[in-house]
Amino acid sequence: LGCLFIGAGQVTMVEADPLAAEVARKNCHTLKSKFDAQTTVIEAFIGTDEIDVSNVDIIVMNPPWGVQSKRADRVILQYAFSQNVEAIHVLHSAKATHLEPLAKEFGWEVEGILESKFRLPPTYSHHSKGKAFTEIICWRFFRPGNSKIPIEEIDELE
């Protein structure tokens, strides 16, 4: 939904969790009058269900990080890297070392555009602390020949 705030004319969200998908639909409905944009929520499992995102320019995602289930993010990342899009933005654990090699396998270049601490509220049963923080990196994947974001623009974000 954040893409609406920066001018996207069409936003397609893919969510596997039925409760999260319902929240996304409600939020789309709430924001409908504020933005002249089309929003779609697809409730599906990437890698299992048939999903058509052929009209998408940019993918923005926060995949499972594979902390509880090793390689849980792999099918989602592979799906994104196989799409014909201009860029892919991924929020992921700063500890992840597999993103760059995987992206390169699919012909993508990568740059980290933001590093920060991310607050993790105890949302799931495996969250044992009342509230925790983890280091994250926001990655931008782009095709070779496509330029990186100029360092001055990244510095302005900090």
Predicted regions and their residues:
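Class I S-adenosyl-L-methionine-dependent methyltransferase catalytic core
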Residues: 1-158
